């Protein structure tokens, strides 16, 4: 097996976790990139966890920026007793069950594929329950649900939280009345997002009555803070937003009601 000190990924425009895992398995200590490359959140976690560095071929070596995925960081502090109590409270168990049910509905309706889509609920002033990363919504169980704070730090749960949690947290910060958020990829709605258009009104009465107008964001790399910030201009006035070239996100007073918006759209 060939061992190396550096792995050349300058041909890639997007570096994913699988590339980092492959590099580490081959003994690489450094990742070579080009300016403007996108490093996904999971890849950033893997770089930090494995102690690798990244270096642009036309610049000096630099450590990868720290990710906010606390679950992937072995130095993350243990959950506080208060967080654990909230995470295992009767209210939390009820919401976990609702999230699981909603996830399976999304899967059966073909609104998600693979491990796509994510769901969250704001259970406290600074606490949010959410689905885990790399998990099919068909396979969701209450034991897989995580809890994070409003900065994205994981404070409870054994599975790592979704890499797109910042989208959810941005909505909770921007719209205080939001309690449940659902992000998914319904094929027809996603087609509108790819085409850069919003569905017309006056065609289906249920859409006009229950959803109304929807907004469309510009594209940014999913999982990044810039991606999360694309919804800021819209979510105060729209419960349902098309995410450019990606999918949709809906918020409501409950997870179930947020999923209803996705269904009607």
Residue ranges and their predicted role:
Residues 65-265:
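Glycine-rich flexible loops
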Residues 1-97, 101:
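Intrinsic disorder
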